[in-house]
């Protein structure tokens, strides 16, 4: 299709929030932007990519051995580290736990709201806030307040505006430390019978028991807009299971805070995936 041709091997749509490359890797990358990067000293912003419709942005930073993606969570953290006053942060259930659990280090006073996946849920969570607003997904969706052409203000997800806001925030000279990235892993179980999973039935109860037997008494959380989500959180761990909205697959997402050993949660995740492969495929 025309949209596939437009985005093939370029843009944010071909990048993952956790991607990184050695300089040797970049030379052989199929991604046009990554392949064009030249070796430089670490710690520099060397590229930025928008997605096909321009509402997402991801940055590329040079490292000691190559380069890596700066995802939406880190971009939002840069903005908040340069901020003052009262803010509301909305972040999806796929955002880094370290961002939402370390807000006390900031100079700004930040209220946190966890949302469903999708930038429309970020906007929905922020619409009634009277403070400064920012919504984020690690995929590079950032929702910010902007002037409304008809008067007042509105919420906008604009990749170019997100890029400029992040670069301006990076230029602030004195600011709090950045957050320490936690561990994240997502696995998609393909060809699932999605009608068998609703996040509340006996199958979900079995999965909850598997997780709690390994990780202890985590708390089940409900998120507006995620009708089939089973989300268990606590002790620096978040494990969620939800159906894809468009494809025959069920996604298992694990998030672990930076100071928590990821091995026990990973083992629990593996058990859940084996169980769901047996009962959903």
Where is each model-derived feature located?
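Cysteine protease catalytic core and zymogen-processing segment of caspase-like enzymes
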Residues: 65-84
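Alpha-helix C-terminal capping segments
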Residues: 37-41, 80-84, 232
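Phosphate-binding and adjacent anionic-ligand microenvironments
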Residues: 46, 52, 85-281
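Short, acidic/turn-prone active-site loops that include or flank metal/cofactor-
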Residues: 2-13, 72-77, 94, 115-120
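Short glycine-enriched, charge-decorated loop/helix-capping segments at active-site entrances
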Residues: 63-66, 149-150
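N-terminal small/polar loop signature for handling phosphorylated ligands or for N-terminal nucleophile
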Residues: 1-62
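Short, charged, surface-exposed secondary-structure boundary motifs
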Residues: 11-20, 79-82, 122-127, 145
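Alpha-helix capping and helix-loop boundary segments enriched in small/acidic/polar residues
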Residues: 17-21, 67-71, 90, 113, ...
